[in-house]
Curated annotation (Swiss-Prot):
Swiss-Prot/TrEMBL GO biological process terms: translation
RNA-binding is among the record's keywords: yes
GO molecular function list: rRNA binding; structural constituent of ribosome; tRNA binding
Subunit architecture: Part of the 50S ribosomal subunit; part of the 5S rRNA/L5/L18/L25 subcomplex. Contacts the 5S rRNA and the P site tRNA. Forms a bridge to the 30S subunit in the 70S ribosome.
Organism phylogeny: Bacteria, Bacillati, Bacillota, Clostridia, Eubacteriales
Entry keyword set: Ribonucleoprotein, Ribosomal protein, RNA-binding, rRNA-binding, tRNA-binding
Protein name: Large ribosomal subunit protein uL5
Pfam entry (one): Ribosomal_L5_C
Free-text function comment from the UniProt entry: This is one of the proteins that bind and probably mediate the attachment of the 5S RNA into the large ribosomal subunit, where it forms part of the central protuberance. In the 70S ribosome it contacts protein S13 of the 30S subunit (bridge B1b), connecting the 2 subunits; this bridge is implicated in subunit movement. Contacts the P site tRNA; the 5S rRNA and some of its associated proteins might help stabilize positioning of ribosome-bound tRNAs.
UniProt similarity note: Belongs to the universal ribosomal protein uL5 family.
Length: 181
């Protein structure tokens, strides 16, 4: 069993039940899925950028990403409907817990001048989205082999009904939120 899943079952669930007064264990919010997305604006001119981003995402997550395509043509961006403009991976189950554990404990501490992540990016329905400026913070990515520094969006989808429940869930799981002083 993944270390983070074990922590969730043994520490986080009982704490959340006590704090929010849940009567049933099934009411306790849990992490449902994690979606990692890399938007590729440069893919319009450079089609090799897609392959590089797919390779990076595959190394980071251990799962083959799908490519996302443009829905509409936009002349100002020289974009046609159906062109590949990004890649994304949806992680669930064991892989999700392993990735989140690596993100919190290995990757985020490698960010320069890291003080924690903002707790303002909740969407009102218990989901949290954060952005990373570079893929180099993951130990699976070798500095010499990347062609371009790319950022990514990471969305944590929870079963929480409110942002307060989701914030508490993620805090107990070990997400390093900025300390408000």
């Amino acid at each position: 069993m993944a270390r983070l899943k074990d922590k969730y079952l043994n520490e986080v669930q009982p704490n959340l039940m006590q704090k929010f007064g849940y009567k049933n264990i099934m009411q306790v919010p849990k992490l449902e899925k994690v979606i990692i997305n890399i938007g590729l604006g440069e893919a319009v001119q450079n089609s090799k950028a897609v392959d590089a981003a797919v390779g990076d995402l595959m190394a980071i997550t251990g799962q083959r990403p799908i490519t996302t395509k443009a829905k509409k043509s936009i002349a100002a961006f020289k974009l046609r409907a159906g062109m590949t403009i990004g890649t994304k991976v949806t992680l669930r189950g064991e892989r999700m817990y392993e990735f989140v554990d690596r993100l919190f404990n290995v990757a985020l501490p490698r960010v320069r001048d890291f003080r924690g992540i903002s707790d303002k990016s909740f969407d009102g329905r218990g989901n949290y989205t954060m952005g990373l400026k570079e893929q180099l913070i993951f130990p699976e990515i070798e500095y010499d082999k990347i062609d371009k520094v790319r950022g990514m969006d990471i969305t944590f989808v929870t079963t929480a009904k409110t942002d307060e429940e989701a914030r508490e869930l993620l805090k107990l799981m070990g997400i390093p939120f900025v300390k408000v002083s």
